[in-house]
Amino acid sequence: LAEVTMSIMQKQKARDRAAGYARDFVPLMKQILPACVERDIKVIANAGGVNVEGCAGAVRETARDLGLQGKLKIGIVTGDDILDRIDDLLGRGIKLRNMDTDEPLVTVRNRIQSANAYLGAQPIVEALDGGSQIVITGRATDTGLTLAPMIHEFGWAADDWDKLAAGTIAGHIIECGAQCSGGICQYEWKTIPDLANVGFPIAEASSDGIFVITKHEATGGRVNVPSIKEQLVYEMGDPRQYITPDCIADFTTIQLADDGADRVRVFGIKGRAATDSLKVSISYSAGYKAVGTLVYAWPDAYEKAKAADGILRARLDRLSLQFDQIMTEYVGANATHGPLAGEPSSDLAEVQLRVGVRGSDRTPIERFTKEIAPLILTGPPAVTGFAGGRPKVEEIVAYWPALIPKSEITPHVEIMEV
């Protein structure tokens, strides 16, 4: 669940009380539920969004349609959604300060769209221990989804920090799917085979905390030490303090070793006690934006795109339009590396002009969208790329990370019979 996804789901639920969860999860479960029951395969997913009960109910109805009554239980984990508690929390002095800016949440109180604490593995473990074959959560850590079945299966103690850290790192490695099995891998990327049929990663865990990352045979991609290393540094932060609700993992202790074709053994991991806080993901409305694009062709593609940007800005100034920010990128010249790219070649085949504006007032953003198309006939020559029509105004949903005392969050576990 991406940060912005929760706000989208809150809006969906506001329009339809039965909505607010990952709708594509239910048809996927329809495909695999019979096999899960037959082979005793457990499924853990944070597909519940802001309506975990609704998602679980839809899965239950699907299971009944498949004739699986009485053959499985669905665990429901809630307690992460604190949107309705914001005023109470602020009133009791819990400021929910922005972790990046240190601003108190009260500065954006009237624009909040969603607020969810990241739950860890323990409530999922409780659901598994209660016999759940399917466990559905709302906001939970990606690592907790992987750690929970290890705790359930091996009976790890809640203070066995090294093993909890190992399970956490296993979750970190596989949380982005094929990103660790060849997808977007920089190391010798041209030689990675058959990404069209890329194999998703598997973590083979053992009770001592050592695990192996692999993938299914006869699938594409590659699992090797470089592919695992690249994933390890993804969204890592301080390598000595990878903080989760369950523990703090020390990435500097990780050891990797090839364990055969498409197999990497991960071991030596150390951890320590978790903090007394949970992270909260808050989304809020932050104004509006619009982005317009045009493509200019050789010769002088970059110069034409720059000239078009100058013309556009002059016209916007003449209209006295006020924006919080206006940003220009030249895709194909320097959009990725910015000033580090140096001066673009004078012989580029084509350059896309990409201009975006943002602001708190929708009116000037709307007016901006009407100024891109005129450049087609009143700007530099050899222009294309306008078939998509006028740019559209979009609401900006911003992210507000905060911390909350663990004592303020009480996960709730319910087990539903099919």
Walk through the language-model features, giving the residues of each:
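A conserved active-site cap/scaffold subdomain adjacent to cofactor or substrate pockets
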Residues: 164-270
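Flexible, glycine/charged-enriched surface loops at secondary-structure junctions
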Residues: 69-73, 180-195, 239-258, 315-331, ...
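Gly/Ser/Thr-rich loops at beta-strand to alpha-helix junctions
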Residues: 2-3, 47-56, 139-145, 360-362
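C-terminal non-catalytic interaction/assembly regions of soluble proteins
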Residues: 267-418
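Catalytic or ion-translocation cores adjacent to nucleophile or general acid/base/metal-coordination motifs
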Residues: 24, 65-82, 147-188
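Short glycine-rich or small-residue beta-strand-to-loop segments that form or flank ligand, phosphate
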Residues: 15-16, 40-50, 135, 352-359
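Gly-rich Lys/Arg/Thr-decorated short loops/hinges at beta-loop-alpha junctions or inter-strand turns
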Residues: 2-18, 37, 82-110
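Active-site glycine-rich loop that binds ribose-phosphate moieties when present
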Residues: 114-128
